[in-house]
Design a protein with these regions (language model features):
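Glycine-rich phosphate-binding "P-loop"
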Residues: 57-74, 139-146, 223-237
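His/Asp/Glu-rich metal-coordinating catalytic cores
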Residues: 1-115
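Active-site neighborhood of phospho(di)ester-bond hydrolases with catalytic His/Asp-centered motifs
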Residues: 9-12, 31-36, 56-60, 91-95, ...
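Hard-cation-handling environments
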Residues: 77-197, 202, 257
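Redox- and metal-dependent alpha/beta enzyme cores, enriched for Fe-S-associated oxidoreductases
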Residues: 187-223
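Proline-aspartate-enriched helix->loop->beta-strand connector
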Residues: 246, 250-256
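A short, acidic, amphipathic alpha-helical segment used as a generic capping/interface helix at domain edges
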Residues: 177-186, 234-248
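Short acidic, glycine/proline-enriched helix-loop-strand junctions
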Residues: 265-288
Length: 291
C-alpha cells in the first residue's frame, strides 16, 4: 500500500516470476499486463484476467495466431529425432530465461534417452529460478530436467558437447554467446541442423541466418550450410488470447503497447465496439482521468 493506493501482483504467464501489476486507487483500478501468455507453458501457468477499469495490454501478436502448443512441441521433437537418427547434432539457440528451460522440460519429458547438453547464461539463470520454486509450474520437473541435462562449464565440456544429440545454448537470436562457437564447428557437417524456437528480431544474427544463410562469426560473415527449422514456442498470447483476456478483464478503456502497427490495428478493430481503445506511440504521454 502507498497512501490510498494499493498494488497487487498477478502471474503473467510469460515466464516464472513475470507479473501483471494491478493498481487500485480510490477512483479507479488499472491493470498493467507486461508480457503475458494466456496458455500454460512447461514452466509457467496461464495468466488469469483481473477485473479493472483501465487495461494496459501488450499487443505483440495482435493479428497473428499460434498453432496449438502441443502440436508445435511434437513437431519440434520429431525434427530433433530425425536429425539425431542421421547422426547429426541439433543446435537449439535459446533465450537465457524462459525458452531454454522450456526446451529442457520438453526434451526431458518426450525423449529422455537423448544426450542433451546445456550451455550459456541459461545455466546460471536456471539456478536462480530454482531458488524460487513456488513461481515455477511443477518445479520438481524442472529440477529433474536440469539435473538430467549435461551442463557445460568450461572448454573441455564444450568440446565434448560437439558429440551430443542436442545442444541448448544462448544466445537465442544468435547475436553472441556459446552458440557462435558451436556454429563455427558444426557448420562443416550437413547432418547437423539448427532449430530456432524464438523470435528473431530485424538485424539479429538469427534473422540474417534465415534470410541470407550467413552469420557473422568472430568478425567474418560466414556461410552456414545447415538446415534451419523454425518453431513457434512463443510465451506471448496470440490475437485470440489477447482479445479474450481483454474482454474478461471488462475494462472501460484499453491502452495497447508493445505492438507493431500491423498488430495494433486488428486488436483495435475487434475490441473498439466493446471498450475505448487507445493506440499511443512511443514517448507519447497518457493522462489518466477517472470517469
Amino acid at each position: 500500500e502507498v497512501g490510498t493506493w494499493r498494488c497487487r501482483l498477478h502471474g503473467a504467464g510469460h515466464i516464472p516470476g513475470a507479473a501483471m501489476v494491478e493498481i487500485e486507487t480510490p477512483e479507479t483500478r488499472i491493470l498493467w499486463s507486461g508480457d503475458i501468455d494466456t496458455r500454460d507453458s512447461p514452466n509457467a501457468g496461464a495468466a488469469s484476467p483481473v477485473d479493472c477499469d483501465i487495461l494496459c495490454l501488450e499487443g505483440t501478436y495482435g493479428g497473428r495466431h499460434h498453432k496449438p502448443r502441443a502440436e508445435e512441441e511434437a513437431r519440434f521433437v520429431a525434427r530433433i529425432l530425425e536429425v539425431v537418427s542421421r547422426g547429426g547434432t541439433a543446435l537449439v539457440p535459446a533465450f537465457a530465461s524462459g525458452r531454454g528451460q522450456d526446451i529442457l522440460r520438453i526434451l526431458h519429458k518426450e525423449v529422455p534417452n537423448l544426450n542433451v547438453h546445456y550451455d550459456g547464461m541459461g545455466t546460471r539463470v536456471t539456478k536462480e529460478w530454482l531458488g524460487c520454486p513456488e513461481l515455477i509450474r511443477d518445479a520438481d520437473r524442472m529440477v529433474k530436467a536440469f539435473r538430467w541435462s549435461k551442463r557445460v562449464t568450461g572448454k573441455s565440456d564444450r568440446k565434448k558437447a560437439l558429440d551430443a544429440d542436442v545442444i541448448v545454448t544462448t544466445s537465442g537470436m544468435l547475436d553472441g554467446g556459446p552458440v557462435i562457437w558451436y556454429l563455427n564447428r558444426l557448420r562443416h557437417s550437413g547432418s547437423n541442423a539448427i532449430m530456432l524456437t524464438g523470435y528473431q528480431a530485424e538485424g539479429s544474427g538469427g534473422r540474417k541466418l534465415i534470410e541470407e544463410g550467413k552469420l557473422p562469426i568472430f568478425g567474418t560473415l560466414t556461410p552456414i550450410p545447415l538446415e534451419v527449422d523454425k518453431f513457434n514456442l512463443s510465451n506471448h498470447a496470440d490475437h485470440e488470447g489477447l482479445s479474450e483476456f481483454a474482454r474478461s478483464c471488462n475494462p472501460k478503456d484499453l491502452i495497447l503497447f508493445h505492438a507493431t502497427e500491423g498488430g495494433r490495428q486488428p486488436l483495435h478493430t475487434e475490441l473498439a465496439e466493446e471498450m475505448t481503445v487507445y493506440l499511443p506511440l512511443n514517448n507519447e504521454p497518457i493522462t489518466i482521468i477517472p470517469r
